[in-house]
């Protein structure tokens, strides 16, 4: 309502204090899921940005570059051009307030607490692609396509690209000094920065990259930047030493690529057959470059030194810019190391799944996300009826399919108990429940009865085993009984042996 500078300053201080308390209150709450944690981070980030903007206004007010603050203090003291009159200043401000309410008679009083409470319930919109999985994985498919379709890249699988994209030092230096490579590195850096800002909203990325730039400048000044040589134009004596070659034929054996590099270093034409290249290079053995015919040069040798110096300076600047971009990319890759590793594992896992399994996995992840966001006293959201793991959450869908946990096996011997998955079914034959059921049937729990779950089948098999072993056959030498004078009972075989020995 009041437009005085003093009131605006007081209001700004109050807003900063309220926002600071809101940040503390929000951070004291433990988010139930990773998605909620991400939303909380962006919400706090927005409040911190509001604090910074308001603080900048306060700094400008206290700097008082336009003298408005001194004028405000003087006005509060009633100092005017005609003298000091405190009451006149008071009534002028009172009149201003009354006129404001006359112009806005139905103005609604806005409760500051309601506005700040609404900030705590704010849910910022965070855009992620389907491949990024709410910030769990990187989506580098665009960068991958640029890499495999470029001169500096190789035709590798996407999973292999995830191993090499963070190692630009492995790319030959001569392939980096191209506009294509520069555009690729800039696009890669732009994506990593954007992804980092979305997944780590509370990190001060500007300070991190500023530190990378300062460290790079120090290393560049000392000449220790990895993969960067300050001398971009190679010397003619370091490419091919012509003193070792007496004929053109010997020079041809060096190879067309080395001949091309040597000619390019000297500013000569690099085209033609290997024989023509060797002849052109061999001319420089006994003839200085200044005396060579102009037709041998790729560009006119006129003012060649100045052009060469300008080209060298331009290439040096490009190489420095590329090296700085590489340093930023490597720093971000170090910060996102866990995400990169998680992306590799996800890609390898997807390669072993069918489309239906991937869809089921995606639905399972969505179910788990909603489960995490439920209140502690809420019901477990498990639409796919997945088994509950050790952490109280449904297991991943791919693990569910791997172990065949959708197959039900019932065992009548165990009291019609259900076993889910082939592995659990095979293991239960040695467990206490099945062993107890076999003892109740009077049947030994041997390997012969594995895969037998019906009581009738178990009894029939036991009967056949007994018949095969001759258990039910009459054996008089073992089952016929004899009694001696003292009333001792023996079977026929034992009684006959004792009688032959004269003991009975």
Swiss-Prot record:
Q: Which residues carry this modification: N-acetylserine?
A: 2
Q: Name one GO biological process term.
A: mRNA splicing, via spliceosome
- Extract the GO molecular function terms from the UniProt entry: RNA binding; zinc ion binding
Chief location of this protein within or outside the cell: nucleus
Q: Where is this region: Disordered?
A: 293-319, 355-374
Subcellular location, in the record's words?
Nucleus
Superkingdom in the source lineage: Eukaryota
What is the role of this chain?
Answer: Splicing factor homolog to SF3a60 that may be involved in pre-spliceosome formation. Is necessary for gametic cell fate determination.
Q: What is this protein called?
A: Splicing factor SF3a60 homolog
> What is the species listed in this Swiss-Prot or TrEMBL entry?
Arabidopsis thaliana
- Gene encoding this polypeptide? ATO
